[in-house]
Regions:
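Conserved HGGG/HGGXW glycine-rich cap/lid loop of the alpha/beta-hydrolase fold
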Residues: 2, 13-75
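Conserved alpha/beta-hydrolase "nucleophile elbow" surrounding the catalytic nucleophile
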Residues: 37, 109-111, 224
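Active-site loop/oxyanion-hole signature of alpha/beta-hydrolase fold enzymes
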Residues: 48-56, 64-105
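Flexible "cap/lid" loop of the alpha/beta hydrolase fold
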Residues: 115-158
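Hydrophobic, aromatic-rich cap/lid helix
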Residues: 181-210
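Short beta-strand/loop motif that positions the catalytic acidic residue
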Residues: 215, 221-223
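Conserved alpha/beta-hydrolase "acid-adjacent" motif
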Residues: 228-234
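Catalytic active-site module of serine/aspartate enzymes centered on a nucleophile-bearing elbow/loop
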Residues: 244-269
Length: 269
């Protein structure tokens, strides 16, 4: 991100207030993009640590960045069901009613944000003209171990606090992130809500293949290697199941740095 800090807007979605910003300028009709971040992150955290840089997108698009329910500046409640991926997809559609009510948008997501986009897109595909699915999360049978870890993490926070959870979940980043000074984005969920957020993630999975096969939205899948939390198996599944989807895999930091311009080019194609 560059330039002065963006103004924070809020939109009421059910019983939550979602915080969002906008940057860039739509050069013509239909040039709005929306960024959906990963679990426990926030609208700008992944860019702040240098993981992504969406400035190429903002040169020709109005880019909406928003904090998911319970994350960053957005509010949320204690019910884990609020944080399931289908419900986060409904939140996103509600936000689109406010930020782009009359035109479809380009959706760009990361991990939980990728899942959010997919649930929104299978529900209302006409709301999107492009999908960019970065670092898809675990899914299906591969997800089982992570479900156990999410539930155990929620219990640990309630029993021993956030610091204990952070220590237990610390680990080396994948090699593709080795060039970053700190590849771990700070947890942007209040400690009081984090157990609910994790339990919501534990209840979640991607849409069924039959729903994904029905999508007719140009889709780019961006994955990196060496990360069990974002396995190539999910990325390959999405690229196989979604009609016409393209897959690009980054194995090195240099390849990762090519993603932002690649996304801008994909949206312009």
């Amino acid at each position: 991100m560059s330039g002065p800090p963006a103004s924070i807007h809020t939109t009421a979605i059910g019983d939550a207030e979602l915080a969002w910003t906008e940057e860039g300028h739509a050069s013509r009709s239909g040039r709005t993009a929306i960024w959906a971040h990963g679990l426990t992150s926030s609208a700008t955290a992944q860019e702040t640590v240098g993981m992504f840089d969406w400035s190429p997108v903002t040169r020709d698009h109005r880019l909406i960045r928003y904090d998911a329910r319970g994350h960053g500046r957005s509010t949320g409640g204690a019910d884990p069901e609020q944080y399931t991926w289908p419900n986060l997809g409904r939140d996103l559609l509600g936000l689109l009613d406010s930020v782009s009510p009359d035109e479809p948008v380009a959706g760009i997501g990361s991990s939980m944000g990728t899942a959010t986009l997919l649930w929104a897109a299978v529900a209302e595909p006409h709301r999107f003209h492009h999908l960019v699915l970065t670092t898809p999360p675990t899914a299906g049978q591969v997800r089982a171990a992570h479900v156990v870890a999410y539930r155990a993490g929620a219990d640990l926070i309630e029993r021993s606090g956030l610091a204990a959870y952070e220590a237990a979940s610390a680990g080396p980043p994948p090699a593709v992130l080795s060039g970053l000074a700190d590849a771990r984005t700070p947890i942007a969920v209040p400690e009081s809500l984090l157990p609910s957020v994790l339990r919501g993630a534990a209840r979640s999975d991607l849409p069924a293949d039959v729903e994904l096969r029905a999508l007719r939205v140009p889709t780019l899948v961006l994955a990196w290697s060496g990360d069990p939390g974002h396995p190539l198996s999910t990325a390959r599944r999405l690229a196989t199941v979604i009609p016409g989807a393209q897959l690009c895999v980054a194995d090195t930091p240099g390849q990762l740095r090519e993603w932002p311009q690649g996304v801008a080019d994909f949206l312009d194609a």
